Amino acid sequence: NYLMFPTVNLAQSGDTSEMAVERFDKDVLPFQPSYLLILIGSNSLRAGVPAEDVIADLKTIKEKCLSHHIRPVFLTIPPLNPAHIKRAFDEPTAENWQSLIAAVNAYIRTQVHIDITPGMADSHGILRPELAVDGIHLDPPGKKMIGAAINNAWKGILALPDTAWQED
């Protein structure tokens, strides 16, 4: 376990942001969480889904959270390693993936969020290979980085007033 508080990981490998929206009611609501850590969009953006579509999905998840008294906490989207994705899955990565991720992360940074990405990219903005053998799903070293970022920010998240989640 990488976090200093109890969590349930609802991630599904291969999920798009649209799929995350579709399974919200079934997967999230039974747990009645106070907070929801949200890291979605990598698979969508890798495939070239427009940033605006992923942002719309993030907004929908935020609305669903707030309507059920759940505080959404967005996590910034890590970089990708297209060569490793190609080798692991024989799948291409959209040529403009970096600008797509940058656009979605710019939106995320306007919300209650935790930046989990510092130190993940090499000098070219590519996900460091030791963090994810397949180029997209973080292995234990990458998960430890995410855990440390969340743990370091969590006290500040808990201290936020309710109004922090109402602003768009």
Language-model segments: which ranges?
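Charged helix-capping and loop-helix junction motifs
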Residues: 51-60, 97, 101
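Structural recognition of the beta-strand scaffold that forms the well-ordered cores
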Residues: 6-11, 35-39, 71-76, 113-115, ...
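Glycine-rich anion/phosphate-binding loops
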Residues: 15-21, 49-57
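Surface-exposed cleft-lining segments at the edges of enzyme active sites
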Residues: 10-12, 42-52, 89-95
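Serine-esterase "nucleophile elbow" of acetyl-processing enzymes
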Residues: 1-13, 18-32, 163
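Histidine-centered active-site loop/cap adjacent to the catalytic His
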Residues: 20, 112, 130-168
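Substrate-gating cap/lid alpha-helix
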Residues: 82-118
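Cell-envelope and extracellular/periplasmic
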Residues: 9-15, 37-45, 59, 66, ...
